[in-house]
Amino acid sequence: MSKDYRVLLYYYYTTIEDPEGFAKEHLAFCKSLQLKGRVLVAKEGINGTVSGLKEHTDAYMEAMKANPLFEGIVFKVDEEEQHVFKKMHVRPRPELVTLRLNEDDVNPNELTGKHLSPKEWREAMLAEDTVVIDARNDYEYDVGHFRGAIRPDIKAFRELPDWIRQNKEQFENKRILTYCTGGIRCEKFSGWLKKEGFEDVAQLDGGIVTYGKDPEVKGELWDGKCYVFDERLTVPINHVAPTVVGKDYFDGKPCERYVNCANPECNKQILCSEENEHKYLRGCTPECRVHPRNLYVKEHQLSPEEHQARLDALGEKLPARL
């Protein structure tokens, strides 16, 4: 199939006086171009990923670049065979990335870490007295990361400042490098690090996505794939020596396939092979496998007898019905 669609990833810190009004107008504009995706708008700027046919994404980029609010905006562009979203959403938010720093909030246009090009980043990672901090969530790290990067034990970005404070001794008197998918989280996080007293802080300009597209570094020193927040879920980065670092949630075998737990009240994202999805009814715990609203059971129209037969193989049982 020909790759007639484009996926645009972008952000821009600026001042949007009326995020609600802007979001409403921007949604209408995106729909007029038949785009699909997710765009967040806040008083501090805009952050989005959209997909559409090339002529439509070209028109979108042209309009955004012509808007004085977004002068100098940079788009990361991927080619795809189809849309990577089902709908188009533009939503106002208090923050573009949720750190909840309140009075300690950082304006990346005033305070942020030094931007390193992909080539500079590769060289910096190999230097002594340097630590590399992954600014993403644990499940993003697990499917792919820079070699030797520290994995903060966090489920959400807002937990990162507390984690840094609790582990501060690891980073004192060292150069800190930090990275994320497209760069937006690190713009604010690196500024926060400097505000906390860390003096030598740098970030990967354009994030992992830009690093993977650089014609010179070609994603070298990246292990696994990069998690993305659309229907693709992961994209390749290392075009020199690709590896698999993700591990199946159930048996630990190499895996890069993400699914959501079939218990809608859990919805945990796990790495899981097709074989284990069927074996474990896409449930991440025994409780999720017997949940009365288990989506796997519903999708495959399993009768109670068929459901129990699957559980028998695991030594588990459906709860007794009253």
UniProtKB/Swiss-Prot annotation:
Disulfide-bonded cysteines: none
Enzymatic class: oxidoreductase
Active site: 180
Catalyzed chemical reaction(s): uridine(34) in tRNA + AH2 + O2 = 5-hydroxyuridine(34) in tRNA + A + H2O
Keywords associated with the record: Oxidoreductase, tRNA processing
Top-rank lineage group of the source organism: Bacteria
Annotated Rhodanese domain residues: 126-220
GO MF term (any one): oxidoreductase activity, acting on paired donors, with incorporation or reduction of molecular oxygen
The keyword Flavoprotein belongs to this UniProt entry's keyword annotation: no
Enzyme Commission number: 1.14.-.-
Pfam families hit by this protein: Rhodanese, Rhodanese_C, UPF0176_N
InterPro entries registered for this protein in UniProt: Rhodanese-like_dom, Rhodanese-like_dom_sf, Rhodanese_C, TrhO, TRHO_N
BP-aspect Gene Ontology terms: tRNA modification
Family recorded in the similarity comment: Belongs to the TrhO family.
Function: Catalyzes oxygen-dependent 5-hydroxyuridine (ho5U) modification at position 34 in tRNAs.
Cited HAMAP family: TrhO
Protein name: tRNA uridine(34) hydroxylase
Taxon lineage: Bacteria, Bacillati, Bacillota, Bacilli, Bacillales
Gene: trhO
